[in-house]
Each structure stands twice: as structure tokens, then as C-alpha cells.
């Protein structure tokens, strides 16, 4: 795995930016042409990582009015001019042995150091997904429908979602949304399964993710309308029972207070 990160640069290199600006503006090439009243001078420090910190490439770029003039690359181990205007600067930097050694060392002191500091909050960060299942339409058994597996609030984005029907993987009629960024370093996606539920069918959404020790498996069971009605009635009765129990306790508590008076 490889990547590129722009990281914090120490004060020494910012001093170098001022120094190289003065050198550049004092060169004969700069004096022989009109110098704009307003100009932009940029310094960019880039760290390239391969397999974590197994291989680190450090690059610094000096840019004057959107034109790069000088560059240091740890693969070269020295400064080189990108344009003729940058030749005096590259020669000057390479002649400053202490400064050159400092720049060479920054593959470790800047890149590798900041990699370890930032890792727990960036590429090593992991957030477990939340998985739910729902039908797109409330329909009776034996009617075509769409079963949706919602996988939300996970990081990183690498994830595997599969549908199973009665322990057999379903591949036909499976449609997934693209990975959706939530804007807070988490993702979500939806995996839909076209199906015609039969009584007794058990559908399972299986989710595998780096943050999980084992896959998350959420089930949905096909039920007849009468079974659903009985279940809802049972839930409703249980809730009403809790309400009446609570009211009874309140009345009993108040009556006890009245007797004590």
C-alpha cells in the first residue's frame, strides 16, 4: 500500500523559504526582467509512504508564481533546479552542508514521526458498522418485494456485504448502492435483494469489516399476516400491561403517603 501525505514542516525549512526567496530575487535572472509588485512564493513538503513506513520518500518543492524552481527529493539526496531560475538556489542549498543534512534527515524526523502521531486518528481509525434490515414495501407473503440491508456509520470504507436465504447465499437480484461518504469520516451503503418471501424463509444480511472480530449477521423472517398481527397484539398487550402496572404503583404509593399523614 502506498500513499502521499502533506505534513508539518519544522521551522528550519520555513527559514529556508525566506532565504531562497532572497537568493532568487537577487539573481541576475531576476534582475533582468520585470518583477511584479505582488507575487506568491510557496513551499510544499510531501511525504510518500509505501507499506506503512517501510519505504518513505520525502520531497520539498519551491514554487514562485505557480512555477516550481527548486526541488529536493530523498531519492536524489540533493536539491536540483527545475528551471534555470532555480539553479543558483539548488547550488546554494547543496553547499550548506548542515542544512542539507537536516533536510535529508527529515524523512525520519518529519515523515516517519508524523506518520506515527497521525495514524490512530486517520488510516488506523476503525468504527464498527450499524446493520439493520427492512422491507421497502409492506406486502403479504408470496408477493414480490425488496429487502434492504442498511449498513451505516463505519470506517474504513473496505466492507463486504452478502445476502443469504435459508443459509444459502443469494447472488441473483442483488443490487448495492455506491459507497456513500457521510462527511464525518464514516461511510454507509445499502444492499437490496429482490425476493418473493415464502412462509418460514429466513433472510440474513452478513457484514464483514476490518473493525469486527467476527461478521455481523442480522436476520429477517418471513411471516404471514396473521402471525404478524398476533405478534403486534402481543407487543401491544405487553406495553399496556406495563402502563397499568405503573399506574397501580403510583396509586399505591400515594395511598401509603395518605395513611402516614
UniProtKB/Swiss-Prot annotation:
Q: Which domain of life is it from?
A: Eukaryota
Q: What is its main location?
A: membrane
Q: Name one GO molecular function term.
A: MHC class II protein complex binding
Cited Gene3D superfamilies? Class II Histocompatibility Antigen, M Beta Chain, Chain B, domain 1, Immunoglobulins
Q: Which residues lie on this side of the membrane: Extracellular?
A: 33-230
User: Which Pfam families does the entry link to?
Assistant: C1-set, MHC_II_beta
Family (UniProt): Belongs to the MHC class II family.
Name of this chain's protein? BoLa class II histocompatibility antigen, DQB*0101 beta chain
Q: Species name for this entry?
A: Bos taurus (Bovine)
Amino acid at each position: 500500500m502506498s500513499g502521499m501525505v502533506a505534513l508539518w514542516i519544522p521551522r528550519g525549512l520555513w527559514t529556508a523559504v525566506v532565504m531562497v526567496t532572497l537568493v532568487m530575487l537577487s539573481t541576475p535572472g531576476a534582475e533582468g526582467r520585470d518583477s511584479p509588485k505582488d507575487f506568491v512564493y510557496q513551499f510544499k513538503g510531501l511525504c510518500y509512504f509505501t507499506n506503512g513506513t517501510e519505504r518513505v520518500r520525502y520531497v520539498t518543492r519551491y514554487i514562485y508564481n505557480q512555477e516550481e524552481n527548486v526541488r529536493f527529493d530523498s531519492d536524489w539526496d540533493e536539491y536540483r533546479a527545475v528551471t534555470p531560475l532555480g539553479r543558483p538556489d539548488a547550488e546554494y542549498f547543496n553547499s550548506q552542508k548542515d542544512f542539507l543534512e537536516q533536510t535529508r534527515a527529515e524523512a525520519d524526523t518529519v515523515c516517519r514521526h508524523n506518520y506515527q502521531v497521525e495514524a490512530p486518528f486517520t488510516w488506523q481509525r476503525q468504527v464498527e458498522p450499524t446493520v439493520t434490515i427492512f422491507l421497502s414495501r409492506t406486502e403479504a407473503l408470496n408477493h414480490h418485494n425488496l429487502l434492504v440491508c442498511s449498513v451505516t456509520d463505519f470506517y474504513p470504507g473496505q466492507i463486504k456485504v452478502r445476502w443469504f436465504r435459508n443459509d444459502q447465499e443469494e447472488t441473483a437480484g442483488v443490487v448495492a448502492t455506491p459507497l456513500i461518504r457521510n462527511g464525518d469520516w464514516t461511510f454507509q451503503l445499502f444492499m437490496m435483494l429482490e425476493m418473493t418471501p415464502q412462509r418460514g424463509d429466513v433472510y440474513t444480511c452478513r457484514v464483514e469489516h476490518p473493525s469486527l472480530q467476527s461478521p455481523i449477521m442480522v436476520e429477517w423472517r418471513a411471516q404471514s399476516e396473521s402471525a404478524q398481527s398476533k405478534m403486534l397484539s402481543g407487543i401491544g398487550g405487553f406495553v399496556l400491561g406495563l402502563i397499568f402496572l405503573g399506574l397501580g404503583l403510583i396509586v399505591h404509593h400515594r395511598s401509603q403517603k395518605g395513611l402516614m399523614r
